[in-house]
Amino acid sequence: MALNGCQSLIEQSYQPSISPSSNPQIVDEVQKNDPRAAMGAREHPRIVASYGGEYKDAKTERLVARIAGALTAVSENPRQSYRITILNSPAINAFALPGGYLYVTRGLLALANDASEVAAVLSHEMGHVTANHGIERQKREEAEVIASRVVAEVLSSDIAGKQALARGKLRLAAFSRQQELQADVIGVRMLGEAGYDPYAAARFLDSMAAYSRFMSVDPEADQSLDFLSSHPNSAQRIDLARTHARAFGQEGSVGDKGRDYYLDGIDGLLYGDSPEEGYVRGQTFLHGGLGIRFDVPPDFHIDNKVEAVMATGPNDIAVRFDGVADNQNQSLTNYISSGWVTGLDPSTIQQITVNGMEAATARASADRWDFDVTVIRNNAQIFRFLTAVPKGSDALEPTADVLRASFRRMTPAEAASLKPLRIRVVTVRPGENISTLAARMMGTDRKLDLFKLINALPMGAAVSPGDRVKIIAE
């Protein structure tokens, strides 16, 4: 959660004044007088702002530019230039805008284990650019919107319009999945022709699928239920990527992984949350700038987003935490009833104290959900917890109690001691094994699982003296 967001009224969109880097890593100058480049240029500041700004580290920028440069040399459109931006986000994501704007998050760089895996991601995004997928999708979206409006107007039926819109979304989803598969084909070809391991695409798709399972509160949940997703399911993409890679030779016998220079380039990379947005440490959220901290119950997962801190737990329990400026200095009981809570039960509003701070609570309900609303005043700000459980669940009060009981001010010494986590590349010494190395991991209660994940170590794998591995530490 951004400090800026809590010092003024929290909004659903985050638009800080962040300008493009004065010295970005550019493979080539963005082509002038290109309408596609103009479209990308318009969207670039918004993309950068929504992902926490640019990640500025000369060593890592040079690494990414080196990989992109090798791919550009074998591009289907050698006249196409690219601008590569590393986004300051722990999310694992990469995407492209028309005109050659490519984006990769530092979270993705932290998960990758060699240059060929990042090359697989970038070549896929370059495939979108060279195939003009962004322009094609925009045209298709405009056509589907027009078509659904025509159906609604001709038939004079809201139901018909909604049905037409739903069919349009399905057609767009299929179109997007087709684009993704086409970009995969282009990407694997570029990988092999650039001299990288062509099997890196399948390998990194495996890693991303494993990360998705790791982050899920329910690891057994079906990851393929979202049939409107713009990406085909991972199993399908992995199989197809391996099939296309075989054109270059057998797995393990072709291409360069670029592991050593890649690990050199990400050693010291910021991992997880940035200082401006606070830190997640296991079941605890801490924000030195705001001077506050709180815990979530066991088995909950915290997701620190720009606009708010979200937490999810078993049995569909969800928590949202954010803050607003205390501009009117009204009583907190009046604040709760001022209209921002839907389905509020006024009879449940009561004033309380939370670790010496003025606070108030209330209950609300809407559709299939019951809510606890807790607001706490501290230093001219109002912090807000919204806890949601399925209607009738007995977990509402225990969950809200944990949040309230643990919310407190940090001491100046506590705030000053907070440090960001980083990727640290270490060499395995004699006598060390996966368990001893995982014990050095910080910021997680699942040390062994996360160590295996970020190093792409399969079940039963071992390490040997001299191997280089990643750990997460301050």
Residue ranges and their predicted role:
Residues R293, D299-H301, N433, A462, ...:
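Residue-level marker of beta-strand positions
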Residues R446-E474:
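Extracellular LysM carbohydrate-binding repeats and other cell-envelope/extracellular binding modules
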Residues N4-L290, F294-V296, H301, V306-A308, ...:
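A Zn2+-metalloprotease active-site environment signal
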Residues R320, S337-T387:
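Signature of long, low-cysteine stretches enriched in small and polar/charged residues
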Residues D299-H301, V309-M310, I317, D322, ...:
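Extended non-catalytic domains of envelope/secretory-pathway proteins
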Residues A413-D445, D467:
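Primarily a LysM-type cell-wall glycan-binding module
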Residues A119, I302, F385-R422:
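Surface-exposed amphipathic alpha-helical segments
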Residues T312-G323, R424-V426, I471-E474:
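Short, surface-exposed polybasic-and-hydrophobic patches located at secondary-structure transitions
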